[in-house]
C-alpha cells in the first residue's frame, strides 16, 4: 500500500511532505506487515525516488490504496512535472495492478448523492476502530495536516535549530501515516470478508 501527506490537495499549490509504503504478505498476520515512512529532507523528487524505490523493491503483485488513483499518484506526478524531475513510478502503480478501494465507493456515492466515504468511516462500518493521532490538543485530520502540521514540518528544513523540533514532528507524522497505511490494508481484507487485527488500529497517540 501507499499513502502520501501533503500541504494541499492541488499539486499546483501544495507540496509533498511524506510518503509511506506498506508491504504485506497475505499468508501472514497483518501485524507482520512492514512499513517505510519517507520524509522531506531535501527535495520532493528525492523523497519520491526513495519511496518508489522501496515500493518497486517489494516486488508485490498488487498495490492497494485508498484514493491512490484519484489523488495520491496524480499529485506525485503533478509535483514531479512542476519540478521538471524525472522519477519513474513502478509498474505496480498503474492499473490493473493498482487496486484503489475508493473508486467504487466514490462511484456509488455519486450515484446516490451521498458524501464520499472516508477511510475511517469505511473501517468503522466493519467494526474496526481507526487509529487516532492527536496533535496540539485536537485530532489530526487531512485538513489540519495540510494547513498546520505539514507547513510546520517544512519550516524546520534547512535549519540547525529546527532539527530537534523536526524530530518530534516526524513522530507525529509517522503515527498518522502508519495508521493510514494499516487502515488501508485492513479495509482491503475486510472487503474480502477477512477479519484482521493490526498494530495501529484503535491506537491513539497524543503530542
Language model feature labels by segment:
Residues 30-31, 68-192:
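Metal-dependent phosphoesterase core characteristic of DEDDh/y 3'-5' exonuclease domains
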Residues 58-61, 182:
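Short alpha-helical basic/polar micro-motif
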Residues 1-58:
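Conserved RNase H-like, two-metal-ion catalytic cores of nucleic-acid enzymes
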Residues 18-21, 40, 82-85, 117-118, ...:
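Short, low-complexity, polar/charged sequence segments that are solvent-exposed and flexible
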Residues 39, 64, 172:
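Conserved short-loop catalytic and cofactor-binding motifs
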Residues 2-4, 66, 99:
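Active-site flanking residues adjacent to catalytic metal/cofactor-binding acidic residues
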Residues 60-68:
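Proline-aspartate-enriched helix->loop->beta-strand connector
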Residues 189-207:
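Acidic catalytic cores of enzymes that act on phosphate-bearing nucleotides/polynucleotides
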Amino acid at each position: 500500500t501507499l499513502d502520501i501527506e501533503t500541504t494541499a490537495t492541488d499539486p499546483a499549490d501544495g507540496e509533498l511532505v511524506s510518503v509511506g509504503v506498506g508491504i504485506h504478505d497475505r499468508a501472514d498476520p497483518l501485524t507482520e506487515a512492514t512499513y517505510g515512512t519517507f520524509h522531506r529532507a531535501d527535495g520532493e523528487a528525492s523523497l519520491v525516488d526513495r519511496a518508489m524505490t522501496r515500493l518497486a523493491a517489494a516486488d508485490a503483485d498488487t498495490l492497494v490504496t485508498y484514493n491512490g488513483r484519484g489523488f495520491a499518484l496524480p499529485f506525485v506526478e503533478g509535483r514531479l512535472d512542476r519540478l521538471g524531475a524525472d522519477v519513474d513510478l513502478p509498474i505496480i502503480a498503474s492499473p490493473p495492478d493498482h487496486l484503489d478501494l475508493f473508486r467504487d465507493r466514490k462511484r456509488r456515492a455519486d450515484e446516490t448523492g451521498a458524501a464520499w466515504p472516508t477511510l475511517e468511516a469505511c473501517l468503522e462500518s466493519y467494526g474496526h476502530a481507526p487509529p487516532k493521532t492527536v496533535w496540539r490538543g485536537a485530532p489530526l485530520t487531512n485538513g489540519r495536516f495540510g494547513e498546520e502540521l505539514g507547513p510546520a514540518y517544512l519550516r524546520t528544513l534547512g535549519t540547525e535549530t529546527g532539527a530537534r523540533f523536526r524530530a518530534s514532528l516526524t513522530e507525529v507524522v509517522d503515527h498518522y501515516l502508519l495508521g493510514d497505511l494499516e487502515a488501508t490494508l485492513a479495509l482491503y481484507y475486510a472487503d474480502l470478508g477477512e477479519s484482521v487485527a493490526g498494530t495501529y488500529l484503535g491506537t491513539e497517540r497524543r503530542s
